[in-house]
Each structure stands twice: as structure tokens, then as C-alpha cells.
């Protein structure tokens, strides 16, 4: 169990759960309240209530619980494997499939399916074996998966060094006037809603390039290329320029087309093989759910 101490230095009294929400960016307010209620967060060595108001010089002690280990079951679920060798796989993930197990999704995930198919790297533990980078449940498309630790380490370094090119198809609201564009706006967790990301001055540098593929009366199909890989980056950036993704339940408008989640597809991945150095490029077609939506827009 990991322990962390924070000294409250402000003369102004503040609720402990609200204060820690800003201090612990990796935890939601609900997570923090649960830790307080269960006695994992104490003030001056004493348990407190979630509405306790901190005083200047209070010492807050946080004992982080070890993450729950889930027994990940191997499941015979069909997977679209675009490429495979001894070190990695390229998978075309369908829309609606969760990438790895969690408390709310213990089975039926991509990891459950892949473990039935082959061995995966162990660097990310039993919950996320082989997962080098993630895409959201309702985002479809290409994903790199590592089959051994050596490949996993190298692939992670390559992504951090911007040596992996990733492009996406996105169907957005509104008609984008310019054929090309770059969105350079920092992204961080939304202080008002911890489950969401937002463009914030103090955020991490985030850059998305886009070009228009097709225009409709009230919508635009674009290709996006990530220069950085922040959580929800394309979704947040497109909302920032007032062209949110069609169907996006978090960042989109209340009135949107029913596409069962954001219209976003990982269309291509390009990189050099982490072990052999061979240049690799993989590309998929626009998925049927996006094609069906665009056919309706043409009518």
C-alpha cells in the first residue's frame, strides 16, 4: 500500500473532498469520498467525514489501496486481426467493444478475446496485458498489441517519441470551411467534471491535424492525425473549434444523430517494427456504421 502526505497550507477552510479533487487528478470526487469513508484518508491521524473542513497546517495522510486483481478469463470471441507476427498484433477493434477488463466490464473485452488467441506481454499486469495504447469503447479501428515485454517497452518508447503515426476518420457537426487545419490547444482533466477532459491553459501540449474528406449540408467527414495522444484528444479538440463529433455522448450537442457513440474510427497506423525495424503501414476502410450515416445525409 502506497502512502502520501499533503499539508494543508491555506488559512481558508475548505472541504477535504473538494480540496483533494484538485490535488489528486487521477481520482474522481466519488473515489476520494469512498477512500475517506473507508478510512484510507485521515487528517492528523484521525478519520474524518467527507464534509470535514480543513484547517491550516492539517496533515492529510492518503493510503492508496492496491488495485483489485481481476481473474481475466480467456474467451473465444471473434477478433479481426489485420496483422500478426511473433512480437505484435494489429487489431481492427469493433465499435462498442471495451479494450480491457475493469470492475464494470470483467469479460467480453478485447483482452479477453486476445488471451484466448495468444500470449500477451505482462508489463501492464493481468488487467491490461499487451495494451500499448487504447481507444475508447465506442471508437472503432486499428490498435497495436504487444505479444512480449521487449516489444511492449520499445513500442511505448516509440509512441512517446512520436514515432508512430495514427490517423482517424471523424464525422463532425457543421461544415468546416478550410480544407486543412491544425488545432494546437492544451488538454487536461476538466476541473468541473473529473471524468471529462477539456482545453485548459495549464494542460499538456496537444496537437491535432485535420483535413476535409467530404462535406455534407450540416456535417463534415475529416481525417485527423494525432501529433500527441491525450485522452479524448480528437473529441475534445473538435468540440473546442465548435465541430463536435456526431453521436458523442460526452462532448457533443444534446441533439445529434443516433450512432451509438462518437463517430470516430482509427483508420491507419504507420511505424517501424520494434524488433526488426521493418517499416509497417496498415489501413482500414471507413466502417459500415459511418457509411450508413453518410448515406442518410446524402438523401
State what each model feature region is:
Residues 1-182, 289-293:
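RNA pseudouridine synthases
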